[in-house]
Structures are given as structure tokens and as C-alpha cells.
Curated annotation (Swiss-Prot):
Coiled coil: none
NCBIfam families: rRNA_methyl_3 (TIGR00186)
Name of encoding gene: mrm1
EC number: 2.1.1.-
Reactions catalysed: a guanosine in 21S rRNA + S-adenosyl-L-methionine = a 2'-O-methylguanosine in 21S rRNA + S-adenosyl-L-homocysteine + H(+)
Pfam families per the UniProt record, alphabetical: SpoU_methylase (PF00588), SpoU_sub_bind (PF08032)
Phylogenetic classification of the source organism: Eukaryota, Fungi, Dikarya, Ascomycota, Taphrinomycotina
Compartments it resides in: Mitochondrion
Enzyme class per UniProt: transferase
Stretch list, region Disordered: 121-141
Transit peptide, residues from-to: 1-11
Name of the protein in question: rRNA methyltransferase 1, mitochondrial
Amino acid sequence: MIRSRVNLAREVPKKAKAHLSKERRLIKEDSEFVFGTHSVKNALATRKRECRALYVQNADIHSEFEEFLNKLQYKIPIKSVNKEHLNQITACRPHNGVVLEASSLNVPTISDLLFPAGEEYNNKNGQDSPHNDLNEGKSSSSDNYPPLYVYVDGITDPQNMGAVIRSAYILGAKGILLSKKHNTFLSPVVSKASAGALEVFNISHVKNPMVFLRNSVLKGWKVIGTKPALPDNKDQIYTPHKIKTELMNEPKILVLGSEKGLRTNILTQCSHYVSIPGGDKYVDSLNVSVAAGILLYSLVN
């Protein structure tokens, strides 16, 4: 069962909170506990969160993060605690001996994409592209043209969400766009599953998904919905290779959903449809994070 705005701070047992209260006097109600080396280091480096305290398991990790903070010229308290306490504040998730107490991510909400189709995109002269001010985050391919965004709708598993974000960042998407109501909360679990990509990537919420996608098509964006190629399907369904060739020079939004498929009202807003060949009546689809990797690799490269 998915709870709205899952917060690891609220999942911490009272016993653990009591112990940490003795050490820090107070844990803020809006605190989250970011865990894992990559997620913690990226959160500290980008400072998209208010970083409040580090909890480390041993002297070696203490020294590692003390040196890391010195390089960043950033000062926050580093508290040495035992593994049991780290297990408690992370609900026994794999934390690598380090946990960061921080505020939740402040994800902006947008109504449309500012980058119109056909506009020249070139950062070599030092000018920023209009769609780069969606967020203070980054992409791994800031100079790529045409741009590709990933719109996510209906992914309620935090591991899948993290894996999609990680693939999108590594494979060169410009950013992640999320519906507010139909996805898992961007929790520290998502951050860990993304190998810390959540902390650095361009990520925005979309105010009204149907209006957003419809307006994007009108502006010239090619909105590509993922859809199984069933025999009775009347829509033209592209393979990844064919849609790459067809839309090579067009700005794109790849729309991904759960394994149940995209909602009908989202599918109707898409300008194109793509399906990865394979499967049968027993297993007819890939995990969404695997599908995301295949499609992104094809579309970006």
C-alpha cells in the first residue's frame, strides 16, 4: 500500500528518535534521512536540500566525510553512532554506514515546457536554453539537441522510480517530469535506488498532465507513449529503431507508466506510440526501468 508523501523520518521507531534526540536535542519534523554513500555525497554537493547533520558508523567513514565536507567548504555536524541506530532510522535499509538528516526535496511545479520545437539549441556561446530553468538540477548531456524529457505516470514502486531516474540521467535525458498524484513520493528510498541521481537531476512536477501533454504536442514536441503492439491495436506502433529514425531531429517527451500500462486519458494525448518487441501471452511486458533503459538508449543515441 502506497502512502502519500512517505517520509523516512516518520517511519523511524520512537526508540530511535528518543536516542537521537539525546544526541541532537531535536530532529525537525520535516527531516528525511538520506542514506547510502552516493546519495549522501550528491545531496551534500548540490545542496538542493537543507543538510542538517551526518550520522556515521565508524572512524573511517567519519574521516572520509570530514574530508569531503572540507573540499566542499561546507560545515554540518558529524555524529558517530552505531550500526543499530543507523538501521533504525533507515528502517534497516542498506545505508553503507552513513545517513544524512536533511529537508525534503523542493520539487518545482511547471505548467508547460518553455522550449518550443524548432528553436535552435546551442550552449556553446554561453547562452542558457529556456528549458534549463525548470530546475536547478543537471542532466548528463546538457548540450544535446534535440532535447528529450521523460514523463512518468503511475510508477508507485520507489525502486522502479529510482532506477528510471538513474537511467534517464546516465543516458542523456534532459530531465524527469512527474504527475503529482499517480507516482510514489520522491523519498530517500528513491534516492538510494537512483544511486544519487535524484539529488542532481532536473526533476519537476506537472500541474495538469493532460493539458501539459496536449500543449506540448501543439508546440511541436513529439510525445511518445509506451504501448503494447497488440493484434487488434489500430494505432501505428513504432519499434524503438523506427521511431528513432522517424523523430531523430525532433524534441521529444517519452511517457512511461506502470506495468499495467498508461492511463487511457494519458495515451490519448500522445502523438506517437512505441513498443519493444517480444513477450507472449504469459509475459507480455518488461519492467518499466528496463524498458526505460532500452528506449532511452535508442532515442538519445
